[in-house]
């Protein structure tokens, strides 16, 4: 298994498009599976359309589902931080994409994005792993 780790700045963005980095990683391979994993308890990875408002809609929906207030038992960190720890239940910490001829088999409008509503951590690691097959 080949692996690489991306260092991602999330200080000013809640949705970070990882698609170009994933494509670049996959070009060194032929056929197999690429896993994109974020090893953090308050972030996730999704496949969505970006640039047409869907990314903002996702953030708005998550903010409505997980309001930042004092209702959470997990109460350390900034106000409402407990909501951040529930995010991975809604947006999984990984996605796996089939790869053929070194290209991720994404649909025309699909992008791989890091989702991070937690403003306490301005940097995130994203692990890319490739399994030949």
Curated annotation (Swiss-Prot):
Q: What Pfam families does this protein's entry cite? A: UPF0047 (PF01894)
Q: Which domain of life is it from?
A: Bacteria
Listed under GO cellular component are: peptidoglycan-based cell wall
**Belongs to which family?**
Belongs to the UPF0047 family.
What is the protein named? Answer: UPF0047 protein Rv2556c
Question: NCBIfam families this protein is in?
Answer: TIGR00149_YjbQ (TIGR00149)
Q: Which residues cross the membrane?
A: none
What are the top taxonomic ranks of the organism? Bacteria, Bacillati, Actinomycetota, Actinomycetes, Mycobacteriales
Identify the SUPFAM superfamilies for this entry.
Answer: YjbQ-like
> Could you tell me which species this protein originates from?
Mycobacterium tuberculosis (strain ATCC 25618 / H37Rv)
Q: Which InterPro entries match?
A: UPF0047_YjbQ-like, YjbQ-like_sf
């Amino acid at each position: 298994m080949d692996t690489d780790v991306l260092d991602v700045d999330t200080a000013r963005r809640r949705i970070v498009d990882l698609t170009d980095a994933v494509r670049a990683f996959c070009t060194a391979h032929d056929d197999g599976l690429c896993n994109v994993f974020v090893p953090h308890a308050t972030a996730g990875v999704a496949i969505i359309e970006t640039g047409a408002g869907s990314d903002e809609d996702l953030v708005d929906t998550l903010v409505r589902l997980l309001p930042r207030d004092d209702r959470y038992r997990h109460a350390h960190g900034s106000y409402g931080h407990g909501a951040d720890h529930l995010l991975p239940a809604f947006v999984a910490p990984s996605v796996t994409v089939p790869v053929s001829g070194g290209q991720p088999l994404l649909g025309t409008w699909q992008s791989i994005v890091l989702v991070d509503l937690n403003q306490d951590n301005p940097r995130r690691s994203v692990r890319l792993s490739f399994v030949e097959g």
